[in-house]
Protein backbone atom coordinates (compact mmCIF):
# COMPACT_ATOMS: atom_id res chain seq x y z
CA UNK A 1 0.00 0.00 0.00
CA UNK A 2 1.02 3.64 -0.43
CA UNK A 3 1.76 4.29 3.25
CA UNK A 4 4.34 1.52 3.18
CA UNK A 5 5.95 3.11 0.12
CA UNK A 6 6.45 6.35 2.05
CA UNK A 7 7.82 4.49 5.06
CA UNK A 8 10.36 2.65 2.92
CA UNK A 9 11.98 5.95 1.96
CA UNK A 10 13.29 6.45 5.50
CA UNK A 11 17.04 6.47 6.06
CA UNK A 12 19.10 6.48 9.27
CA UNK A 13 17.14 7.67 12.28
CA UNK A 14 13.82 7.53 10.46
CA UNK A 15 14.63 10.59 8.35
CA UNK A 16 12.96 11.13 4.98
CA UNK A 17 14.42 13.90 2.86
CA UNK A 18 11.90 16.32 1.39
CA UNK A 19 13.56 15.85 -2.00
CA UNK A 20 12.29 12.26 -1.88
CA UNK A 21 8.92 13.56 -3.01
CA UNK A 22 10.15 16.11 -5.55
CA UNK A 23 13.47 14.99 -7.05
CA UNK A 24 12.99 13.27 -10.42
CA UNK A 25 15.29 10.37 -9.55
CA UNK A 26 13.57 9.90 -6.21
CA UNK A 27 10.16 9.95 -7.85
CA UNK A 28 11.25 7.11 -10.11
CA UNK A 29 11.88 4.98 -7.02
CA UNK A 30 8.16 5.02 -6.20
CA UNK A 31 7.28 3.62 -9.60
CA UNK A 32 4.33 5.99 -10.02
CA UNK A 33 3.70 9.41 -11.56
CA UNK A 34 4.43 12.79 -10.01
CA UNK A 35 0.82 13.41 -8.97
CA UNK A 36 0.66 10.06 -7.20
CA UNK A 37 3.92 10.80 -5.39
CA UNK A 38 2.32 14.00 -4.08
CA UNK A 39 -0.65 11.91 -2.91
CA UNK A 40 1.66 9.48 -1.10
CA UNK A 41 3.30 12.41 0.69
CA UNK A 42 -0.06 13.87 1.67
CA UNK A 43 -1.54 10.64 3.02
CA UNK A 44 1.65 9.65 4.84
CA UNK A 45 1.45 12.96 6.72
CA UNK A 46 -2.32 12.76 7.28
CA UNK A 47 -2.13 9.18 8.61
CA UNK A 48 0.79 9.94 10.92
CA UNK A 49 3.32 7.74 9.12
CA UNK A 50 5.66 10.72 9.07
CA UNK A 51 5.71 14.28 10.40
CA UNK A 52 7.41 17.43 9.21
CA UNK A 53 10.29 18.47 11.42
CA UNK A 54 13.17 20.90 10.89
CA UNK A 55 13.13 20.90 7.11
CA UNK A 56 12.69 17.16 6.70
CA UNK A 57 10.25 14.39 7.46
CA UNK A 58 10.58 11.94 10.35
CA UNK A 59 8.87 8.57 10.63
CA UNK A 60 6.53 8.41 13.61
CA UNK A 61 7.26 5.95 16.41
CA UNK A 62 3.98 4.07 16.05
CA UNK A 63 4.39 3.83 12.27
CA UNK A 64 7.85 2.37 12.78
CA UNK A 65 6.56 -0.24 15.21
CA UNK A 66 3.94 -1.29 12.69
CA UNK A 67 5.64 -1.05 9.29
CA UNK A 68 9.30 -1.89 9.91
CA UNK A 69 10.66 -5.28 8.90
CA UNK A 70 9.61 -7.64 11.68
CA UNK A 71 7.08 -5.07 12.90
CA UNK A 72 3.50 -5.60 13.93
CA UNK A 73 2.18 -5.37 10.37
CA UNK A 74 5.05 -4.77 7.91
CA UNK A 75 2.86 -5.22 4.83
CA UNK A 76 -0.08 -3.19 6.18
CA UNK A 77 -2.47 -6.10 5.78
CA UNK A 78 -4.09 -6.09 9.22
CA UNK A 79 -7.50 -4.57 9.89
CA UNK A 80 -5.95 -2.89 12.93
CA UNK A 81 -3.65 -0.87 10.67
CA UNK A 82 -6.69 0.23 8.69
CA UNK A 83 -8.50 1.24 11.88
CA UNK A 84 -5.49 3.26 13.02
CA UNK A 85 -5.33 5.02 9.65
CA UNK A 86 -9.05 5.80 9.95
CA UNK A 87 -8.52 7.19 13.45
CA UNK A 88 -5.74 9.47 12.23
CA UNK A 89 -7.90 10.74 9.38
CA UNK A 90 -11.28 11.07 11.11
CA UNK A 91 -10.20 11.58 14.72
CA UNK A 92 -7.87 14.48 13.99
CA UNK A 93 -8.37 17.45 11.70
CA UNK A 94 -4.87 17.40 10.19
CA UNK A 95 -4.76 17.36 6.39
CA UNK A 96 -8.04 15.46 6.48
CA UNK A 97 -10.75 18.06 7.07
CA UNK A 98 -13.30 16.21 4.95
CA UNK A 99 -12.77 12.94 6.84
CA UNK A 100 -12.97 14.64 10.23
CA UNK A 101 -16.06 16.64 9.31
CA UNK A 102 -17.89 13.67 7.78
CA UNK A 103 -17.51 11.41 10.81
CA UNK A 104 -17.97 14.09 13.48
CA UNK A 105 -20.53 16.50 12.04
CA UNK A 106 -22.81 14.57 9.70
CA UNK A 107 -25.78 13.15 11.60
CA UNK A 108 -28.34 12.60 8.84
CA UNK A 109 -29.51 8.97 8.53
CA UNK A 110 -28.74 9.02 4.80
CA UNK A 111 -27.01 11.57 2.59
CA UNK A 112 -25.64 12.17 -0.88
CA UNK A 113 -22.38 13.77 -1.87
CA UNK A 114 -24.26 16.75 -3.28
CA UNK A 115 -26.10 17.29 0.03
CA UNK A 116 -22.78 17.44 1.88
CA UNK A 117 -20.99 19.91 -0.37
CA UNK A 118 -22.36 23.20 0.96
CA UNK A 119 -22.19 22.25 4.69
CA UNK A 120 -18.59 21.11 4.21
CA UNK A 121 -17.75 24.34 2.38
CA UNK A 122 -19.16 26.36 5.32
CA UNK A 123 -17.14 24.30 7.79
CA UNK A 124 -13.95 24.82 5.78
CA UNK A 125 -14.58 28.59 5.66
CA UNK A 126 -15.10 28.61 9.41
CA UNK A 127 -11.74 26.90 9.96
CA UNK A 128 -9.89 29.20 7.59
CA UNK A 129 -11.86 32.23 6.31
CA UNK A 130 -8.95 33.36 4.13
CA UNK A 131 -8.68 30.07 2.26
CA UNK A 132 -11.57 29.63 -0.15
CA UNK A 133 -11.97 26.20 -1.71
CA UNK A 134 -13.60 25.84 -5.10
CA UNK A 135 -16.80 23.86 -5.49
CA UNK A 136 -14.94 21.34 -7.63
CA UNK A 137 -12.33 20.79 -4.90
CA UNK A 138 -15.03 20.22 -2.28
CA UNK A 139 -16.85 17.79 -4.57
CA UNK A 140 -13.68 15.89 -5.42
CA UNK A 141 -12.59 15.59 -1.79
CA UNK A 142 -16.00 14.28 -0.76
CA UNK A 143 -16.02 11.77 -3.60
CA UNK A 144 -12.56 10.51 -2.59
CA UNK A 145 -13.58 10.26 1.05
CA UNK A 146 -16.87 8.47 0.43
CA UNK A 147 -15.34 6.04 -2.05
CA UNK A 148 -12.55 5.16 0.35
CA UNK A 149 -15.16 3.61 2.68
CA UNK A 150 -17.87 2.58 0.24
CA UNK A 151 -16.19 1.54 -3.02
CA UNK A 152 -18.21 1.14 -6.18
CA UNK A 153 -19.63 -2.32 -6.74
CA UNK A 154 -17.46 -2.71 -9.80
CA UNK A 155 -14.33 -1.77 -7.88
CA UNK A 156 -12.52 1.53 -7.48
CA UNK A 157 -9.60 3.20 -9.13
CA UNK A 158 -6.21 1.58 -8.46
CA UNK A 159 -4.72 4.98 -7.72
CA UNK A 160 -6.83 5.52 -4.63
CA UNK A 161 -4.65 4.25 -1.80
CA UNK A 162 -7.45 4.36 0.76
CA UNK A 163 -10.02 2.28 -1.06
CA UNK A 164 -8.74 -1.24 -0.27
CA UNK A 165 -7.57 -0.15 3.16
CA UNK A 166 -10.68 1.50 4.60
CA UNK A 167 -13.44 -0.24 2.66
CA UNK A 168 -13.06 -3.34 4.84
CA UNK A 169 -13.99 -1.47 8.03
CA UNK A 170 -17.70 -1.45 7.29
CA UNK A 171 -18.22 2.14 8.47
CA UNK A 172 -20.12 3.43 5.47
CA UNK A 173 -22.37 1.86 2.87
CA UNK A 174 -23.99 2.99 -0.34
CA UNK A 175 -27.63 2.12 0.33
CA UNK A 176 -28.80 3.35 -3.08
CA UNK A 177 -26.92 4.71 -6.04
CA UNK A 178 -25.23 7.88 -4.77
CA UNK A 179 -26.90 7.67 -1.35
CA UNK A 180 -24.87 6.72 1.73
CA UNK A 181 -25.42 5.79 5.36
CA UNK A 182 -23.14 5.10 8.31
CA UNK A 183 -23.11 1.61 9.78
CA UNK A 184 -23.46 2.15 13.51
CA UNK A 185 -23.02 -0.65 16.00
CA UNK A 186 -20.35 -3.12 17.18
CA UNK A 187 -17.23 -3.38 15.05
CA UNK A 188 -15.89 -6.93 15.26
CA UNK A 189 -12.59 -6.13 13.53
CA UNK A 190 -11.81 -3.20 15.84
CA UNK A 191 -9.16 -4.57 18.21
CA UNK A 192 -9.34 -3.57 21.87
CA UNK A 193 -5.79 -2.24 21.55
CA UNK A 194 -6.78 0.17 18.78
CA UNK A 195 -9.86 1.30 20.72
CA UNK A 196 -7.71 1.90 23.80
CA UNK A 197 -5.10 3.80 21.79
CA UNK A 198 -7.83 6.01 20.32
CA UNK A 199 -9.39 6.58 23.74
CA UNK A 200 -6.09 7.70 25.29
CA UNK A 201 -5.27 9.84 22.26
CA UNK A 202 -8.68 11.51 22.45
CA UNK A 203 -8.31 11.94 26.22
CA UNK A 204 -4.97 13.70 25.75
CA UNK A 205 -6.54 16.05 23.21
CA UNK A 206 -9.62 17.11 25.18
CA UNK A 207 -8.95 16.43 28.86
CA UNK A 208 -5.22 16.09 29.41
CA UNK A 209 -4.43 15.98 33.11
CA UNK A 210 -7.92 14.85 34.11
CA UNK A 211 -8.13 11.51 35.88
CA UNK A 212 -11.64 10.65 34.71
CA UNK A 213 -13.74 10.94 31.57
CA UNK A 214 -17.52 10.68 31.38
CA UNK A 215 -19.14 7.94 29.31
CA UNK A 216 -21.09 10.54 27.33
CA UNK A 217 -17.83 12.22 26.32
CA UNK A 218 -16.33 8.95 25.08
CA UNK A 219 -19.51 8.11 23.20
CA UNK A 220 -20.69 11.41 21.75
CA UNK A 221 -18.13 14.21 21.92
CA UNK A 222 -16.62 15.57 18.73
CA UNK A 223 -13.53 13.55 17.87
CA UNK A 224 -14.45 10.77 20.32
CA UNK A 225 -14.00 7.03 19.68
CA UNK A 226 -17.78 6.65 19.74
CA UNK A 227 -18.29 9.10 16.91
CA UNK A 228 -15.23 8.27 14.85
CA UNK A 229 -15.75 4.49 15.02
CA UNK A 230 -19.57 4.75 14.80
CA UNK A 231 -20.13 2.57 17.87
CA UNK A 232 -23.45 2.26 19.66
CA UNK A 233 -23.77 2.77 23.43
CA UNK A 234 -23.81 -0.92 24.29
CA UNK A 235 -20.66 -1.60 22.26
CA UNK A 236 -18.84 1.29 23.92
CA UNK A 237 -19.91 0.19 27.39
CA UNK A 238 -18.71 -3.37 26.77
CA UNK A 239 -15.33 -2.13 25.60
CA UNK A 240 -14.96 0.22 28.56
CA UNK A 241 -15.86 -2.53 31.02
CA UNK A 242 -13.09 -4.69 29.53
CA UNK A 243 -10.48 -1.93 29.89
CA UNK A 244 -9.43 -2.87 33.42
CA UNK A 245 -8.17 -6.33 32.48
CA UNK A 246 -6.81 -5.23 29.10
CA UNK A 247 -4.79 -2.32 30.54
CA UNK A 248 -3.87 -3.98 33.84
CA UNK A 249 -6.03 -1.45 35.69
CA UNK A 250 -4.39 1.60 34.14
CA UNK A 251 -7.86 2.41 32.83
CA UNK A 252 -10.93 1.38 34.83
CA UNK A 253 -14.66 1.69 34.27
CA UNK A 254 -17.05 2.63 37.07
CA UNK A 255 -20.84 2.85 37.10
CA UNK A 256 -22.06 4.19 40.43
CA UNK A 257 -25.37 5.91 41.13
CA UNK A 258 -25.89 6.42 37.43
CA UNK A 259 -22.51 8.11 36.99
CA UNK A 260 -20.59 6.23 34.31
CA UNK A 261 -16.91 7.11 33.99
CA UNK A 262 -13.51 5.87 32.92
CA UNK A 263 -10.69 6.46 35.40
CA UNK A 264 -7.09 6.76 34.35
CA UNK A 265 -3.87 6.14 36.22
CA UNK A 266 -0.54 7.55 34.96
CA UNK A 267 0.49 5.67 31.81
CA UNK A 268 4.10 4.71 31.30
Regions found by a protein language model. Name each.
Residues 1-268:
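Donor-sugar nucleotide-binding helix/loop cap in glycosyltransferases
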Amino acid sequence: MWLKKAFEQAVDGGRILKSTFSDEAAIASFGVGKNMVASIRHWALACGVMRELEGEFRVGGLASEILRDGGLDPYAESASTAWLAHWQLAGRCFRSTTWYWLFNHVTAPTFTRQELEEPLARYARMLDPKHRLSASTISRDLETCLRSYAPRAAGGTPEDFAEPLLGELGLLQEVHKGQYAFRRGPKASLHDGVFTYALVDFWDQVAQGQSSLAFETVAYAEGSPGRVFKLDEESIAQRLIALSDFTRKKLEWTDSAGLRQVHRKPLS
